[in-house]
């Protein structure tokens, strides 16, 4: 094992659950369930791959503990025994591939969509979420029903073979709505003070312990803070929630962040490293049980956090989406083999905004692990790939990994194509990590790289390949101008190292690329 990452690979424990390392696949909406909430082969393949790649703990995405608590189309369901066979198969494939298996339980509350459930949303108070209808305020009877539902779903998870359960009281889900003053305006014993707003969490753990006993690990995920939320959870409140959770009998706490605007919850390329770590560290000082932290963390950052004693477990969500083999590669001393997450948020855009199954711009095999499993070529062939952008780099790498003899031809002097251009934008320098990954992997897999070469048809014929793959990109659209010399495509402007002096520049369009270009040009002028 590489000593550089020694803390990352120390064994850990949550309650009675021994875990081989400190790397956790956190629960994330993947959209791989069926429309009626059943586990699918696609879901099993996804989770099995992350377990096989070396994660110590795999937590399955939020499943619905209460009938009708659905926020998204492909939401897993654990509200009835009819879902037990699929849940059992899912827990089994995770454990059979070397990881501990847990599942998250989460109800949408006021975020429930009537179009999916046929019923009105419910919440602690009749306060509508953004772009949602006004929820019905839950009665005391409704709260008791919800409490029983969470407890029964936890028991169902235990019966299915899961080794732990996480109660989802973070982001914008039902339980987080009770914790936040912004969504909980109740005047009874479930509203007002920190202890009152946390009361439902005490009720849930008490009801759960009656069914699963004291040895089954149950922990909680909360918002360490709520951004852009008047009356939202503060750090002082989350520290108190953590103390109350430990006193109530939860076995650990996982720290995330919340906001009615997902952009503030999901960390982007522009987010500073370890954004939530100081919050987790402050909470850790208040409790003695384990603290888990998330937020665009990779192996290097995770090692730093553990070494500093700022958390006990590292949740690597998108990092493990991009490369399920991250833990084993790092443990073997080959971090350069880890495919980095470019943080372009196509995953979030698909899952949260479009409500379709998640895909990854860096990992085409995400959610298709079995379908896209690489097989050795029956007969190695000579392959020429034209184009050194991401598509060409991936094509060259995959064909080489299968055993073919590959030559990559790129017209420019550098590889990366549009991604390299995008990496010039302010705040997007980390995109170069994906290009660097490809360069290293192509060299390791024996790909011959020709840069500064314009691949003509005659040139390709002269190379006598068995197969030619064209990945030369597309032509950029350019706005018409009276003087054609004054009209430049966004990508060309990004590619220029300097801007001519003494000229006025107009950027036409207000999309992300245009704004980034304007920002970049102000640095050069």
Predicted regions and their residues:
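Flavin-dependent oxidoreductase catalytic cores
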Residues: 1-386, 390, 394-406, 414, ...
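Short loop/edge segments at beta-strand edges and connector loops
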Residues: 295, 413, 435, 451-454, ...
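A short helix-to-beta-strand connector/capping loop
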Residues: 310, 442-449, 483-486
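Rossmann-like dinucleotide/flavin-binding elements
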Residues: 380-408, 450-458, 464, 472-482, ...
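N-terminal Rossmann-like dinucleotide/flavin-binding domain of flavoprotein oxidoreductases
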Residues: 417-463
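N-terminal Rossmann-like NAD(P) cofactor-binding module of classical short-chain dehydrogenase/reductase
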Residues: 469
